[in-house]
């Protein structure tokens, strides 16, 4: 996934802690075992520091996964790593909720907290 797509902008309130939640209910990728499409909802919750994630670039970043054969756990951790690198938040959580396939659903949650 091309993490260089992710753009940020200056946080105009860096001295105030506030939470931003971004939800993408139409995330798609491909199962690396079966080649079948996977559909899920990605929820990103973060407390920005000096910069915030620009949403249009995030949309294009998510599209990078559309044809990628990648496991749920790898997707979730990769998104967290790339977004933390891009915006260096005070804290961030990425949660992926995957639609049922074969009667089984999965949710993966990963978190980051900056060292003080």
Curated annotation (Swiss-Prot):
Cell compartments where the protein resides: Cytoplasm
Gene3D superfamilies for the chain: 3.30.1130.10
Q: Which InterPro entries match?
A: GTP-CH-I_C/QueF (IPR043133), NADPH_dep_7-cyano-7-deazaG_red (IPR050084), QueF (IPR029500), QueF_type1 (IPR016856)
Catalysed reactions, semicolon-separated: 7-aminomethyl-7-carbaguanine + 2 NADP(+) = 7-cyano-7-deazaguanine + 2 NADPH + 3 H(+)
Gene Ontology biological-process entries: queuosine biosynthetic process; tRNA modification
Q: In which pathway does it act?
A: tRNA modification; tRNA-queuosine biosynthesis
Q: Which GO terms describe its cellular component?
A: cytoplasm
Q: Which GO terms describe its molecular function?
A: preQ1 synthase activity
Q: Where does substrate bind?
A: 53-55, 72-73
Q: What Pfam families does the annotation carry?
A: QueF
* Taxonomy, superkingdom: Bacteria
Task: Please name the catalytic residues of this protein.
Answer: 31 (thioimide intermediate), 38 (proton donor)
What EC number(s) does its UniProt record assign? 1.7.1.13
* Keyword NADP appears in the UniProt entry: yes
* Keywords of the record: Cytoplasm, NADP, Oxidoreductase, Queuosine biosynthesis
What is the role of this chain?
Catalyzes the NADPH-dependent reduction of 7-cyano-7-deazaguanine (preQ0) to 7-aminomethyl-7-deazaguanine (preQ1).
Q: Which family does it belong to?
A: Belongs to the GTP cyclohydrolase I family. QueF type 1 subfamily.
Write down what this protein is called. NADPH-dependent 7-cyano-7-deazaguanine reductase
């Amino acid at each position: 996934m091309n993490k260089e797509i992710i753009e940020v902008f200056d946080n105009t309130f860096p001295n105030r802690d506030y939470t931003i939640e971004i939800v993408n209910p139409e995330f798609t990728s491909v199962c690396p075992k079966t080649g079948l499409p996977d559909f899920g909802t990605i929820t990103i919750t973060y407390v920005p520091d000096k910069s915030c994630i620009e949403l249009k670039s995030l949309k294009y970043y998510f599209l990078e996964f559309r044809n990628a054969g990648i496991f749920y756990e790898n997707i979730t951790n990769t998104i967290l790593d790339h977004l933390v690198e891009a915006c260096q938040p005070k804290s961030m959580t990425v949660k992926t909720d995957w639609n049922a396939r074969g009667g089984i659903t999965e949710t993966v949650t990963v978190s980051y907290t900056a060292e003080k």
